[in-house]
Amino acid sequence: MTPADLAQLLKATAAAVLAEHGLDSAALPDTVTVERPRNPEHGDYATNLALQLGKKVGANPRELAGWLAEALAASDGIAAADVAGPGFVNLRIEASAQNVMVSNVLSAGADYGHSAVLAGKKVNLEFVSANPTGPIHIGGTRWAAVGDALGRLLTTQGAAVTREYYFNDHGAQIDRFSNSLIAAAKGEPAPEDGYAGTYIADIASQVVAKEPGVLDQPDDRMRETFRAIGVNLMFDHIKESLHEFGTDFDVYTHEDSMHTSGRVEQAIDKLRETGFAYEKDGAVWLRTTDFGDDKDRVVIKSDGKPAYIAGDLAYFLDKRKRGFDLCIYMLGADHHGYIARLKASAAALGDDPDTVEVLIGQMVNLVRDGQPVRMSKRAGTVITLDDLVEAIGVDAARYSLIRSSVDTPIDIDLELWSSASNENPVYYVQYAHARLSALARNAAELGIAPDTAHLDLLTHDKEGVLIRNIGEFPRILATAAELREPHRVSRYLEDLAGDYHRFYDACRVLPQGDEAPGDLHAARLALCAATRQVIANGLDILGVSAPERM
Protein backbone atom coordinates (compact mmCIF):
# COMPACT_ATOMS: atom_id res chain seq x y z
CA MET A 1 0.00 0.00 0.00
CA THR A 2 1.57 3.23 -1.20
CA PRO A 3 0.82 6.65 0.35
CA ALA A 4 -1.36 7.34 -2.71
CA ASP A 5 -3.25 4.07 -2.16
CA LEU A 6 -3.75 4.96 1.50
CA ALA A 7 -5.01 8.43 0.59
CA GLN A 8 -7.57 6.90 -1.79
CA LEU A 9 -8.68 4.47 0.92
CA LEU A 10 -8.99 7.36 3.38
CA LYS A 11 -11.14 9.41 0.99
CA ALA A 12 -13.43 6.48 0.18
CA THR A 13 -13.75 5.57 3.86
CA ALA A 14 -14.49 9.17 4.83
CA ALA A 15 -17.22 9.40 2.17
CA ALA A 16 -18.83 6.24 3.53
CA VAL A 17 -18.58 7.44 7.15
CA LEU A 18 -20.14 10.81 6.32
CA ALA A 19 -22.99 9.15 4.44
CA GLU A 20 -23.57 6.69 7.28
CA HIS A 21 -24.01 9.54 9.76
CA GLY A 22 -26.12 11.70 7.47
CA LEU A 23 -23.38 14.24 6.84
CA ASP A 24 -22.54 16.00 3.59
CA SER A 25 -19.85 14.03 1.72
CA ALA A 26 -19.55 16.92 -0.77
CA ALA A 27 -17.45 18.63 1.91
CA LEU A 28 -14.61 16.22 1.16
CA PRO A 29 -11.64 17.98 -0.50
CA ASP A 30 -10.71 16.93 -4.03
CA THR A 31 -7.31 15.77 -2.80
CA VAL A 32 -6.84 13.87 0.45
CA THR A 33 -3.31 13.33 1.75
CA VAL A 34 -1.57 11.43 4.51
CA GLU A 35 1.65 12.45 6.21
CA ARG A 36 4.41 10.61 8.02
CA PRO A 37 4.43 11.62 11.70
CA ARG A 38 7.62 13.22 12.96
CA ASN A 39 7.61 10.73 15.82
CA PRO A 40 7.45 7.13 14.45
CA GLU A 41 5.91 6.02 17.75
CA HIS A 42 2.72 7.81 16.70
CA GLY A 43 2.26 5.51 13.72
CA ASP A 44 3.30 5.00 10.13
CA TYR A 45 1.00 7.71 8.74
CA ALA A 46 -1.35 10.36 10.08
CA THR A 47 -4.24 12.43 8.78
CA ASN A 48 -6.02 15.58 9.97
CA LEU A 49 -9.00 15.03 7.66
CA ALA A 50 -11.46 14.99 10.58
CA LEU A 51 -10.19 18.41 11.65
CA GLN A 52 -10.66 19.72 8.11
CA LEU A 53 -14.21 18.37 7.86
CA GLY A 54 -15.59 18.91 11.37
CA LYS A 55 -16.78 22.49 11.03
CA LYS A 56 -17.90 22.04 7.42
CA VAL A 57 -20.22 19.13 8.23
CA GLY A 58 -21.22 20.25 11.72
CA ALA A 59 -19.56 17.39 13.60
CA ASN A 60 -17.16 17.29 16.53
CA PRO A 61 -13.73 16.66 14.93
CA ARG A 62 -12.63 14.16 17.56
CA GLU A 63 -15.89 12.22 17.30
CA LEU A 64 -15.58 12.24 13.52
CA ALA A 65 -11.98 11.03 13.87
CA GLY A 66 -13.25 8.15 16.01
CA TRP A 67 -15.71 7.08 13.33
CA LEU A 68 -12.96 7.28 10.71
CA ALA A 69 -10.51 5.30 12.84
CA GLU A 70 -13.05 2.55 13.48
CA ALA A 71 -13.84 2.17 9.78
CA LEU A 72 -10.19 2.32 8.71
CA ALA A 73 -9.15 -0.29 11.28
CA ALA A 74 -11.52 -2.73 9.60
CA SER A 75 -9.92 -2.17 6.18
CA ASP A 76 -7.49 -4.59 4.56
CA GLY A 77 -3.87 -3.57 5.04
CA ILE A 78 -4.52 -1.42 8.13
CA ALA A 79 -3.02 -2.86 11.31
CA ALA A 80 -4.29 -0.13 13.64
CA ALA A 81 -6.02 3.25 13.58
CA ASP A 82 -6.04 5.48 16.66
CA VAL A 83 -7.42 8.91 17.47
CA ALA A 84 -4.99 11.49 18.83
CA GLY A 85 -5.42 15.05 20.06
CA PRO A 86 -8.36 17.13 18.86
CA GLY A 87 -9.02 14.99 15.79
CA PHE A 88 -5.94 13.40 14.28
CA VAL A 89 -5.97 9.77 13.17
CA ASN A 90 -2.71 7.81 13.40
CA LEU A 91 -2.40 4.73 11.19
CA ARG A 92 -0.21 1.66 11.22
CA ILE A 93 0.08 -0.37 8.05
CA GLU A 94 0.42 -4.14 7.94
CA ALA A 95 3.90 -5.16 6.80
CA SER A 96 2.49 -7.26 3.97
CA ALA A 97 0.59 -4.23 2.65
CA GLN A 98 3.43 -1.70 2.71
CA ASN A 99 6.12 -3.99 1.33
CA VAL A 100 4.58 -3.77 -2.14
CA MET A 101 6.40 -0.42 -2.41
CA VAL A 102 9.68 -2.31 -2.80
CA SER A 103 8.31 -4.15 -5.83
CA ASN A 104 6.90 -0.91 -7.24
CA VAL A 105 10.32 0.75 -7.16
CA LEU A 106 12.11 -2.19 -8.75
CA SER A 107 9.48 -2.48 -11.49
CA ALA A 108 9.57 1.22 -12.37
CA GLY A 109 13.35 1.59 -12.14
CA ALA A 110 14.58 4.98 -13.36
CA ASP A 111 10.96 6.08 -13.89
CA TYR A 112 9.97 5.57 -10.26
CA GLY A 113 8.50 8.77 -8.88
CA HIS A 114 7.45 10.07 -12.28
CA SER A 115 3.87 11.05 -13.08
CA ALA A 116 1.84 12.48 -15.95
CA VAL A 117 0.23 15.29 -13.95
CA LEU A 118 1.83 17.94 -16.21
CA ALA A 119 1.44 15.96 -19.45
CA GLY A 120 0.55 18.29 -22.30
CA LYS A 121 1.96 21.32 -20.47
CA LYS A 122 4.52 23.22 -22.54
CA VAL A 123 6.88 25.12 -20.23
CA ASN A 124 9.54 27.69 -21.10
CA LEU A 125 12.14 27.84 -18.35
CA GLU A 126 14.49 30.80 -18.69
CA PHE A 127 17.41 30.95 -16.29
CA VAL A 128 21.00 32.18 -15.89
CA SER A 129 20.74 34.59 -18.88
CA ALA A 130 23.91 36.33 -17.71
CA ASN A 131 25.28 39.23 -19.73
CA PRO A 132 28.10 38.17 -22.10
CA THR A 133 30.43 40.68 -20.47
CA GLY A 134 32.17 38.34 -18.04
CA PRO A 135 32.22 34.85 -16.51
CA ILE A 136 29.10 33.65 -14.70
CA HIS A 137 29.15 34.95 -11.13
CA ILE A 138 28.14 32.93 -8.09
CA GLY A 139 24.54 34.21 -8.16
CA GLY A 140 24.13 33.07 -11.75
CA THR A 141 25.75 29.78 -10.78
CA ARG A 142 22.95 29.22 -8.26
CA TRP A 143 20.43 29.56 -11.06
CA ALA A 144 22.48 27.27 -13.30
CA ALA A 145 22.10 24.53 -10.69
CA VAL A 146 18.55 25.24 -9.49
CA GLY A 147 17.17 25.99 -12.95
CA ASP A 148 18.56 22.80 -14.42
CA ALA A 149 17.21 20.77 -11.48
CA LEU A 150 13.80 22.42 -11.81
CA GLY A 151 13.73 21.56 -15.51
CA ARG A 152 14.50 17.93 -14.74
CA LEU A 153 11.90 17.93 -11.97
CA LEU A 154 9.11 19.33 -14.16
CA THR A 155 10.01 16.76 -16.81
CA THR A 156 9.47 13.91 -14.32
CA GLN A 157 5.89 15.16 -13.96
CA GLY A 158 5.24 14.99 -17.69
CA ALA A 159 5.86 18.61 -18.74
CA ALA A 160 7.55 19.41 -22.04
CA VAL A 161 10.28 21.76 -20.82
CA THR A 162 12.38 24.05 -22.98
CA ARG A 163 15.45 25.41 -21.19
CA GLU A 164 16.22 28.84 -22.57
CA TYR A 165 19.05 31.33 -22.17
CA TYR A 166 18.26 34.96 -23.00
CA PHE A 167 21.48 36.35 -24.38
CA ASN A 168 21.71 40.04 -23.40
CA ASP A 169 23.81 41.27 -26.32
CA HIS A 170 22.10 44.64 -26.71
CA GLY A 171 22.62 47.84 -24.80
CA ALA A 172 25.14 49.98 -22.95
CA GLN A 173 26.84 47.11 -21.12
CA ILE A 174 27.99 45.68 -24.46
CA ASP A 175 29.48 49.04 -25.41
CA ARG A 176 31.37 49.14 -22.09
CA PHE A 177 32.58 45.58 -22.70
CA SER A 178 33.86 46.51 -26.16
CA ASN A 179 35.64 49.61 -24.84
CA SER A 180 37.24 47.52 -22.07
CA LEU A 181 38.60 45.05 -24.63
CA ILE A 182 40.02 47.88 -26.74
CA ALA A 183 41.75 49.40 -23.71
CA ALA A 184 43.26 46.03 -22.79
CA ALA A 185 44.44 45.44 -26.36
CA LYS A 186 46.16 48.84 -26.33
CA GLY A 187 47.70 48.23 -22.91
CA GLU A 188 45.65 51.02 -21.35
CA PRO A 189 43.78 50.99 -18.00
CA ALA A 190 40.18 49.82 -18.10
CA PRO A 191 37.60 52.59 -18.55
CA GLU A 192 36.11 53.89 -15.31
CA ASP A 193 32.75 52.25 -16.09
CA GLY A 194 34.32 49.24 -17.82
CA TYR A 195 35.23 45.66 -16.97
CA ALA A 196 38.49 44.39 -15.51
CA GLY A 197 40.13 41.06 -14.82
CA THR A 198 42.49 38.73 -16.63
CA TYR A 199 39.62 37.42 -18.76
CA ILE A 200 39.35 40.84 -20.44
CA ALA A 201 43.04 40.76 -21.38
CA ASP A 202 42.69 37.15 -22.58
CA ILE A 203 39.73 37.92 -24.84
CA ALA A 204 41.35 41.11 -26.15
CA SER A 205 44.42 39.08 -27.15
CA GLN A 206 42.22 36.53 -28.92
CA VAL A 207 40.41 39.27 -30.85
CA VAL A 208 43.72 40.73 -32.01
CA ALA A 209 44.91 37.25 -33.01
CA LYS A 210 41.75 36.71 -35.08
CA GLU A 211 41.87 40.21 -36.62
CA PRO A 212 45.56 41.25 -36.69
CA GLY A 213 44.86 44.75 -38.04
CA VAL A 214 41.94 45.54 -35.78
CA LEU A 215 43.74 48.28 -33.83
CA ASP A 216 44.37 50.14 -37.09
CA GLN A 217 40.70 50.20 -38.05
CA PRO A 218 38.58 53.38 -37.76
CA ASP A 219 37.15 53.74 -34.26
CA ASP A 220 33.56 52.73 -35.09
CA ARG A 221 34.65 49.69 -37.06
CA MET A 222 37.23 48.71 -34.42
CA ARG A 223 34.61 48.98 -31.67
CA GLU A 224 32.21 46.80 -33.67
CA THR A 225 34.94 44.22 -34.34
CA PHE A 226 35.83 43.94 -30.67
CA ARG A 227 32.13 43.83 -29.80
CA ALA A 228 31.19 41.09 -32.25
CA ILE A 229 34.20 38.82 -31.75
CA GLY A 230 34.56 39.56 -28.03
CA VAL A 231 30.92 38.79 -27.24
CA ASN A 232 31.11 35.50 -29.15
CA LEU A 233 34.32 34.48 -27.37
CA MET A 234 32.86 35.38 -23.97
CA PHE A 235 29.66 33.49 -24.66
CA ASP A 236 31.60 30.45 -25.86
CA HIS A 237 33.36 30.45 -22.50
CA ILE A 238 30.04 30.81 -20.65
CA LYS A 239 28.50 27.89 -22.55
CA GLU A 240 31.57 25.73 -21.96
CA SER A 241 31.54 26.49 -18.22
CA LEU A 242 27.83 25.67 -18.01
CA HIS A 243 28.26 22.44 -19.96
CA GLU A 244 31.06 21.28 -17.66
CA PHE A 245 28.76 22.18 -14.76
CA GLY A 246 26.12 19.85 -16.18
CA THR A 247 23.76 22.58 -17.37
CA ASP A 248 22.83 22.81 -21.03
CA PHE A 249 20.14 24.79 -22.83
CA ASP A 250 17.77 23.91 -25.65
CA VAL A 251 17.47 27.45 -26.99
CA TYR A 252 19.67 30.54 -26.94
CA THR A 253 17.75 33.71 -27.78
CA HIS A 254 19.66 36.89 -28.59
CA GLU A 255 18.17 40.09 -27.17
CA ASP A 256 19.57 41.94 -30.17
CA SER A 257 17.33 39.85 -32.44
CA MET A 258 14.26 41.34 -30.73
CA HIS A 259 15.33 44.76 -31.98
CA THR A 260 16.74 43.89 -35.41
CA SER A 261 13.84 41.64 -36.46
CA GLY A 262 11.07 44.16 -35.83
CA ARG A 263 9.63 42.17 -32.92
CA VAL A 264 9.85 45.16 -30.56
CA GLU A 265 7.73 47.21 -32.96
CA GLN A 266 5.25 44.31 -33.24
CA ALA A 267 4.94 44.21 -29.45
CA ILE A 268 4.34 47.99 -29.28
CA ASP A 269 1.63 47.69 -31.95
CA LYS A 270 0.02 44.92 -29.91
CA LEU A 271 0.05 47.15 -26.81
CA ARG A 272 -1.67 49.94 -28.70
CA GLU A 273 -4.34 47.47 -29.84
CA THR A 274 -5.07 46.43 -26.27
CA GLY A 275 -5.09 50.03 -25.04
CA PHE A 276 -2.30 49.63 -22.51
CA ALA A 277 0.22 51.88 -24.27
CA TYR A 278 -0.02 55.66 -24.29
CA GLU A 279 2.16 58.61 -25.27
CA LYS A 280 3.35 61.30 -22.87
CA ASP A 281 6.27 63.75 -23.02
CA GLY A 282 7.29 62.35 -26.38
CA ALA A 283 7.70 58.81 -25.01
CA VAL A 284 5.58 55.66 -25.21
CA TRP A 285 4.48 54.33 -21.82
CA LEU A 286 3.03 51.04 -20.60
CA ARG A 287 0.24 51.13 -18.00
CA THR A 288 1.92 48.69 -15.62
CA THR A 289 0.27 50.36 -12.61
CA ASP A 290 -2.97 48.69 -13.71
CA PHE A 291 -1.32 45.41 -12.72
CA GLY A 292 0.33 46.27 -9.41
CA ASP A 293 3.53 48.02 -10.52
CA ASP A 294 4.50 51.10 -8.50
CA LYS A 295 4.62 53.30 -11.61
CA ASP A 296 4.04 53.13 -15.34
CA ARG A 297 7.08 52.18 -17.41
CA VAL A 298 8.62 53.85 -20.44
CA VAL A 299 8.74 51.50 -23.42
CA ILE A 300 10.05 53.87 -26.09
CA LYS A 301 12.07 56.81 -24.78
CA SER A 302 11.58 60.38 -26.00
CA ASP A 303 14.69 60.05 -28.17
CA GLY A 304 13.03 57.17 -30.02
CA LYS A 305 15.23 54.47 -28.50
CA PRO A 306 13.58 51.45 -26.87
CA ALA A 307 13.83 51.08 -23.09
CA TYR A 308 14.93 47.76 -21.60
CA ILE A 309 11.35 46.64 -21.02
CA ALA A 310 10.66 46.86 -24.76
CA GLY A 311 12.87 43.85 -25.36
CA ASP A 312 11.13 42.00 -22.52
CA LEU A 313 7.74 42.66 -24.11
CA ALA A 314 8.89 41.40 -27.48
CA TYR A 315 10.53 38.38 -25.87
CA PHE A 316 7.38 37.38 -23.98
CA LEU A 317 5.28 37.75 -27.12
CA ASP A 318 7.82 35.61 -28.97
CA LYS A 319 7.54 32.88 -26.32
CA ARG A 320 3.77 32.81 -26.45
CA LYS A 321 3.83 32.63 -30.25
CA ARG A 322 6.01 29.53 -29.84
CA GLY A 323 3.14 27.93 -27.95
CA PHE A 324 4.32 27.89 -24.34
CA ASP A 325 1.57 27.53 -21.73
CA LEU A 326 3.80 28.70 -18.90
CA CYS A 327 6.84 30.99 -18.93
CA ILE A 328 9.05 30.74 -15.85
CA TYR A 329 11.68 33.42 -15.31
CA MET A 330 14.47 32.87 -12.77
CA LEU A 331 15.98 36.21 -11.75
CA GLY A 332 18.46 37.57 -9.24
CA ALA A 333 17.66 39.36 -5.99
CA ASP A 334 18.14 42.76 -7.64
CA HIS A 335 15.29 42.04 -10.09
CA HIS A 336 12.42 41.90 -7.59
CA GLY A 337 10.69 44.81 -9.31
CA TYR A 338 10.46 42.78 -12.50
CA ILE A 339 7.73 40.51 -11.10
CA ALA A 340 4.96 43.09 -11.49
CA ARG A 341 6.48 44.34 -14.73
CA LEU A 342 6.55 40.93 -16.42
CA LYS A 343 3.05 40.03 -15.28
CA ALA A 344 1.82 43.45 -16.40
CA SER A 345 3.48 42.89 -19.77
CA ALA A 346 1.62 39.60 -20.19
CA ALA A 347 -1.73 41.16 -19.31
CA ALA A 348 -1.10 44.21 -21.48
CA LEU A 349 -0.38 41.94 -24.44
CA GLY A 350 -3.78 40.32 -23.95
CA ASP A 351 -2.55 37.28 -22.05
CA ASP A 352 -3.23 35.77 -18.63
CA PRO A 353 -0.68 37.06 -16.06
CA ASP A 354 -0.71 33.58 -14.54
CA THR A 355 1.13 32.32 -17.62
CA VAL A 356 4.14 34.12 -16.12
CA GLU A 357 5.96 32.93 -13.02
CA VAL A 358 8.98 34.74 -11.60
CA LEU A 359 11.35 33.10 -9.12
CA ILE A 360 13.76 35.39 -7.28
CA GLY A 361 17.04 33.96 -6.00
CA GLN A 362 18.89 35.37 -3.02
CA MET A 363 22.60 35.95 -2.49
CA VAL A 364 25.31 33.29 -2.23
CA ASN A 365 28.41 33.78 -0.09
CA LEU A 366 31.51 31.61 0.02
CA VAL A 367 33.36 31.04 3.28
CA ARG A 368 36.84 29.60 3.87
CA ASP A 369 38.46 29.26 7.32
CA GLY A 370 35.53 31.19 8.74
CA GLN A 371 36.21 34.19 6.49
CA PRO A 372 34.24 35.34 3.44
CA VAL A 373 35.84 34.76 0.04
CA ARG A 374 35.13 37.79 -2.12
CA MET A 375 37.61 38.01 -4.98
CA SER A 376 37.99 35.97 -8.14
CA LYS A 377 41.48 35.66 -9.57
CA ARG A 378 40.16 35.49 -13.11
CA ALA A 379 37.26 37.95 -13.00
CA GLY A 380 38.98 40.41 -10.69
CA THR A 381 35.70 41.10 -8.89
CA VAL A 382 33.01 38.61 -7.89
CA ILE A 383 33.36 34.85 -7.41
CA THR A 384 32.52 32.86 -10.54
CA LEU A 385 31.14 29.45 -11.45
CA ASP A 386 34.63 28.30 -12.40
CA ASP A 387 36.00 29.40 -9.02
CA LEU A 388 33.39 27.39 -7.13
CA VAL A 389 33.89 24.25 -9.22
CA GLU A 390 37.65 24.50 -8.82
CA ALA A 391 37.23 24.76 -5.04
CA ILE A 392 34.76 21.94 -4.33
CA GLY A 393 33.93 20.12 -7.59
CA VAL A 394 30.79 19.97 -9.73
CA ASP A 395 28.72 17.61 -7.55
CA ALA A 396 29.26 19.53 -4.32
CA ALA A 397 28.78 22.86 -6.09
CA ARG A 398 25.44 21.84 -7.60
CA TYR A 399 24.17 20.17 -4.44
CA SER A 400 25.16 23.06 -2.17
CA LEU A 401 23.35 25.55 -4.41
CA ILE A 402 20.19 23.47 -4.82
CA ARG A 403 19.89 22.35 -1.20
CA SER A 404 18.30 25.56 0.15
CA SER A 405 15.17 27.40 -0.90
CA VAL A 406 16.08 30.03 -3.50
CA ASP A 407 14.51 32.80 -1.42
CA THR A 408 17.08 32.15 1.32
CA PRO A 409 20.63 33.60 1.23
CA ILE A 410 23.21 30.85 1.65
CA ASP A 411 26.79 30.57 2.89
CA ILE A 412 28.86 27.81 1.29
CA ASP A 413 31.64 26.61 3.57
CA LEU A 414 34.33 25.47 1.14
CA GLU A 415 36.04 23.28 3.75
CA LEU A 416 32.80 21.49 4.63
CA TRP A 417 31.69 20.90 1.06
CA SER A 418 35.07 19.51 0.00
CA SER A 419 35.33 17.16 3.00
CA ALA A 420 34.80 13.38 2.95
CA SER A 421 32.64 13.37 6.07
CA ASN A 422 29.03 12.77 7.06
CA GLU A 423 28.74 16.49 7.83
CA ASN A 424 29.03 17.10 4.08
CA PRO A 425 25.45 16.54 2.81
CA VAL A 426 26.37 15.49 -0.73
CA TYR A 427 29.03 13.08 0.57
CA TYR A 428 26.48 11.63 3.01
CA VAL A 429 23.97 10.89 0.23
CA GLN A 430 26.53 9.70 -2.32
CA TYR A 431 28.16 7.46 0.29
CA ALA A 432 24.80 5.76 0.88
CA HIS A 433 24.59 5.00 -2.85
CA ALA A 434 28.18 3.76 -2.97
CA ARG A 435 27.58 1.60 0.10
CA LEU A 436 24.48 0.09 -1.52
CA SER A 437 26.44 -0.53 -4.72
CA ALA A 438 29.20 -2.31 -2.78
CA LEU A 439 26.56 -4.42 -1.06
CA ALA A 440 25.12 -5.46 -4.42
CA ARG A 441 28.58 -6.45 -5.68
CA ASN A 442 29.29 -8.48 -2.54
CA ALA A 443 25.92 -10.23 -2.83
CA ALA A 444 26.62 -11.12 -6.45
CA GLU A 445 29.95 -12.66 -5.47
CA LEU A 446 28.07 -14.82 -2.94
CA GLY A 447 25.51 -15.80 -5.56
CA ILE A 448 22.63 -14.04 -3.78
CA ALA A 449 20.13 -12.05 -5.84
CA PRO A 450 17.43 -9.62 -4.66
CA ASP A 451 14.07 -11.38 -4.45
CA THR A 452 10.63 -9.87 -3.82
CA ALA A 453 8.94 -13.22 -3.19
CA HIS A 454 9.39 -13.01 0.57
CA LEU A 455 8.97 -9.31 1.36
CA ASP A 456 6.57 -10.35 4.13
CA LEU A 457 9.70 -11.20 6.14
CA LEU A 458 10.61 -7.50 6.35
CA THR A 459 9.07 -6.79 9.75
CA HIS A 460 11.88 -4.97 11.57
CA ASP A 461 11.08 -1.37 12.60
CA LYS A 462 14.05 0.00 10.65
CA GLU A 463 12.91 -1.90 7.55
CA GLY A 464 9.45 -0.39 7.87
CA VAL A 465 10.81 3.14 8.20
CA LEU A 466 12.97 2.69 5.10
CA ILE A 467 10.13 1.18 3.07
CA ARG A 468 7.75 3.98 3.95
CA ASN A 469 10.34 6.58 3.05
CA ILE A 470 10.98 5.20 -0.43
CA GLY A 471 7.20 5.22 -0.82
CA GLU A 472 7.24 8.97 -0.20
CA PHE A 473 9.42 9.72 -3.23
CA PRO A 474 6.57 10.25 -5.76
CA ARG A 475 4.85 12.70 -3.41
CA ILE A 476 8.12 14.56 -2.80
CA LEU A 477 8.64 15.01 -6.55
CA ALA A 478 5.04 16.10 -7.12
CA THR A 479 5.19 18.67 -4.32
CA ALA A 480 8.64 19.94 -5.32
CA ALA A 481 7.49 20.39 -8.92
CA GLU A 482 4.24 22.10 -7.95
CA LEU A 483 6.01 24.56 -5.64
CA ARG A 484 9.08 24.95 -7.94
CA GLU A 485 11.29 23.85 -5.04
CA PRO A 486 13.93 21.29 -6.07
CA HIS A 487 15.62 21.73 -2.68
CA ARG A 488 12.93 19.40 -1.31
CA VAL A 489 14.51 16.55 -3.27
CA SER A 490 17.95 17.05 -1.71
CA ARG A 491 16.52 17.24 1.82
CA TYR A 492 14.52 14.09 1.17
CA LEU A 493 17.64 12.26 -0.05
CA GLU A 494 19.51 13.17 3.12
CA ASP A 495 16.61 11.83 5.18
CA LEU A 496 16.50 8.64 3.12
CA ALA A 497 20.27 8.15 3.37
CA GLY A 498 19.98 8.45 7.15
CA ASP A 499 17.20 5.85 7.23
CA TYR A 500 19.34 3.51 5.14
CA HIS A 501 22.43 3.87 7.31
CA ARG A 502 20.34 3.16 10.42
CA PHE A 503 18.74 0.15 8.75
CA TYR A 504 22.15 -1.20 7.72
CA ASP A 505 23.45 -0.89 11.28
CA ALA A 506 20.41 -2.72 12.70
CA CYS A 507 19.68 -5.38 10.06
CA ARG A 508 22.30 -7.75 8.68
CA VAL A 509 21.77 -8.01 4.94
CA LEU A 510 24.30 -10.69 3.92
CA PRO A 511 25.07 -13.99 5.64
CA GLN A 512 28.21 -14.14 7.74
CA GLY A 513 30.70 -16.98 8.14
CA ASP A 514 29.16 -20.36 7.34
CA GLU A 515 25.60 -19.03 7.47
CA ALA A 516 23.57 -20.19 4.47
CA PRO A 517 21.81 -17.56 2.37
CA GLY A 518 18.11 -17.40 3.14
CA ASP A 519 14.89 -15.76 2.05
CA LEU A 520 15.37 -12.88 4.51
CA HIS A 521 18.75 -12.02 2.97
CA ALA A 522 17.19 -11.94 -0.51
CA ALA A 523 14.28 -9.81 0.70
CA ARG A 524 16.61 -7.32 2.38
CA LEU A 525 18.68 -7.18 -0.79
CA ALA A 526 15.51 -6.27 -2.67
CA LEU A 527 14.88 -3.46 -0.19
CA CYS A 528 18.47 -2.29 -0.63
CA ALA A 529 18.14 -2.39 -4.42
CA ALA A 530 14.97 -0.29 -4.22
CA THR A 531 16.65 2.22 -1.91
CA ARG A 532 19.63 2.46 -4.24
CA GLN A 533 17.28 3.11 -7.17
CA VAL A 534 15.46 5.92 -5.37
CA ILE A 535 18.71 7.62 -4.35
CA ALA A 536 20.00 7.37 -7.93
CA ASN A 537 16.74 8.81 -9.28
CA GLY A 538 16.88 11.71 -6.84
CA LEU A 539 20.52 12.52 -7.55
CA ASP A 540 19.79 12.45 -11.27
CA ILE A 541 17.13 15.13 -10.82
CA LEU A 542 19.71 17.28 -9.03
CA GLY A 543 22.27 16.65 -11.78
CA VAL A 544 24.60 15.04 -9.25
CA SER A 545 26.44 11.76 -9.87
CA ALA A 546 25.54 8.53 -8.07
CA PRO A 547 28.97 6.90 -7.54
CA GLU A 548 29.38 3.13 -7.43
CA ARG A 549 32.52 3.44 -5.33
CA MET A 550 33.90 6.04 -2.93
From Swiss-Prot:
The keyword ATP-binding applies. One of its GO terms (cellular component) is cytoplasm. Its EC number is 6.1.1.19. HAMAP family: Arg_tRNA_synth. Monomer. One of its GO terms (molecular function) is arginine-tRNA ligase activity. It is found in: Cytoplasm. It comes from Mycolicibacterium gilvum (strain PYR-GCK) (Mycobacterium gilvum (strain PYR-GCK)). Belongs to the class-I aminoacyl-tRNA synthetase family. GO terms for biological process: arginyl-tRNA aminoacylation. Keywords: Aminoacyl-tRNA synthetase, ATP-binding, Cytoplasm, Ligase, Nucleotide-binding, Protein biosynthesis. Gene3D superfamilies: Arginyl tRNA synthetase N-terminal domain, HUPs, Isoleucyl-tRNA Synthetase, Domain 1. This is Arginine--tRNA ligase.
